[in-house]
């Protein structure tokens, strides 16, 4: 299994939203899959405990990754 860093998640300056930032280069290189209706997607993974820590102010940022075979 391989993991590729795709970007990061952080709280907005106002604190009412999460900001998601993806590397355009990583996104271009990311593995894609087709849904049953033929739409193309890029699957991403974020650790939910780390997102909670960002939301609660315990962490400033957490990573977004893609896991592939």
List the predicted regions and their residue ranges:
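Single-stranded nucleic acid-binding surfaces, predominantly the OB-fold ssDNA-binding core
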Residues: 1-69
């Amino acid at each position: 299994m391989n993991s590729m860093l795709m970007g990061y998640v952080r709280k907005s300056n106002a604190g009412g939203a999460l900001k998601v930032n993806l590397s355009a280069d990583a996104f271009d290189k990311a593995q894609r899959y087709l849904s049953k209706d033929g739409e193309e997607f890029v699957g991403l993974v974020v650790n939910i405990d780390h997102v909670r820590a960002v939301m609660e102010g315990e962490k400033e940022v957490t990573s977004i990754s893609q896991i592939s075979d």
